[in-house]
């Protein structure tokens, strides 16, 4: 089951005892999933959701909290719809429900954000508002670089109200418009986990956190492997470059190179992949890596000085792009 479906399934089965929270959830669900229609002079409340369990929860809450019956219509998958959709409709008492849930204000005008009783309610009401909004139009992507918990909103006022509810819960959410649709997005991994718990999807949070941890472990392992590969490549190129410079130095100096410097240089050329420490152990008598490095450095310096005097290419000229590409 996809993460979004897991969250919605868990939330649709959540038992909430506090009446004000149940009302806040219902108001948000109707606001984010529904619309008000005037048919034959009557106000009709409709809400379209993507799971049967959400439709059942919605109908049950409408009846238990306000005593109104509702109809449900199933829109089968087909065309642009990949899955079935469920439309819950309250026709006979639509206007009364719209007023009681805050979809209409006292003058009978549609409320553009969230109802005042939800915005000014308790922390539990803020959690319930997020639960209702997510059940209506929420989504949760798999953990990763672009992971996000997102809710599509019916307008900018509703988006800002949802951002405010998140702020009351100590969670940073951002409102933005994407392709003409207002959305509220939470991207931080810790904040996503906290919000899932706040809404009541603790089991899904544990699953999400486990997947997030596994992904982070894999990403860390990949970074370390790439780091090691890069270090090996750098070391190989440095060794090839050093050997090429030493070869050129011996060429420039010819018979004039001091024996101890020539010996260190020949070791570098003969054992191109060996570390300085390994070259020191191969020397006769053995030397420290600092001694080997010092002798090679002096050899190169002497050769470069001679090259300048003679007006010929120095040791750096031996290190070509082609040479490094082959390393």
Swiss-Prot record:
Which Gene3D superfamilies does this UniProt record tie to the protein?
Answer: Homing endonucleases
Q: Which UniProt keywords apply?
A: Cell cycle, Cell division, DNA-binding
Q: Which GO terms describe its molecular function?
A: DNA binding
User: Which superkingdom does the taxonomy of this entry point to?
Assistant: Bacteria
DNA-binding region of this protein: 275-308
Q: Which GO terms fall under biological process for this protein?
A: cell division; regulation of sporulation
For this protein, the record's Pfam families field holds: HTH_WhiA (PF02650), LAGLIDADG_WhiA (PF14527), WhiA_N (PF10298)
Q: Which family does it belong to?
A: Belongs to the WhiA family.
* NCBIfam families xrefs: DNA_bind_WhiA
- State the function annotated in the UniProt record: Involved in cell division and chromosome segregation.
Identify this protein by name: Probable cell division protein WhiA
Origin organism is: Nocardia farcinica (strain IFM 10152)
């Amino acid at each position: 089951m996809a993460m979004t479906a897991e969250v919605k399934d868990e939330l649709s089965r959540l038992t909430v005892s506090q009446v004000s929270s149940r009302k806040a959830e219902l108001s948000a669900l109707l606001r984010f999933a529904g619309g008000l229609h005037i048919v034959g002079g009557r106000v009709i409340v409709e809400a379209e959701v993507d799971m049967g369990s959400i439709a059942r929860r919605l109908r049950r809450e409408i009846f238990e909290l306000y005593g109104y019956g509702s109809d449900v219509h199933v829109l089968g998958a087909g065309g642009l719809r990949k899955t079935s959709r469920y439309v819950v409709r309250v026709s006979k008492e639509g206007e009364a429900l719209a007023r009681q849930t805050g979809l209409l204000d006292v003058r009978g005008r549609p409320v553009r954000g969230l109802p005042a009783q939800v915005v000014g309610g308790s922390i539990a009401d803020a959690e319930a508002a997020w639960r209702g909004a997510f059940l209506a139009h929420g989504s949760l992507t798999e953990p990763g670089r672009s992971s996000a918990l997102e809710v599509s909103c019916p307008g900018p006022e509703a988006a800002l109200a949802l951002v405010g509810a998140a702020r009351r819960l100590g969670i940073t959410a951002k409102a933005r418009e994407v392709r003409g649709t207002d959305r509220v997005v939470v991207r931080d991994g810790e904040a996503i986990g906290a919000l899932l718990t706040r809404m009541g999807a603790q089991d899904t949070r544990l699953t999400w956190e486990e997947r997030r941890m596994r992904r982070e472990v894999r990403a860390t392992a990949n970074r370390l492997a790439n780091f090691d590969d890069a270090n090996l490549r750098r070391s190989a190129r440095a060794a090839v470059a050093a050997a090429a410079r030493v070869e050129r130095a011996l060429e420039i100096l010819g018979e004039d190179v001091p024996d101890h410097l020539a010996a260190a240089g020949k070791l570098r050329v003969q054992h191109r992949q060996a570390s300085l420490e390994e070259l020191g152990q191969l020397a006769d008598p053995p030397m420290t890596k600092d001694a080997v490095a010092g002798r090679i450095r002096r050899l190169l310096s002497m050769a470069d000085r001679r090259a300048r005097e003679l007006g010929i290419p120095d040791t750096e000229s031996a290190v070509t792009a082609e040479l490094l590409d082959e390393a």
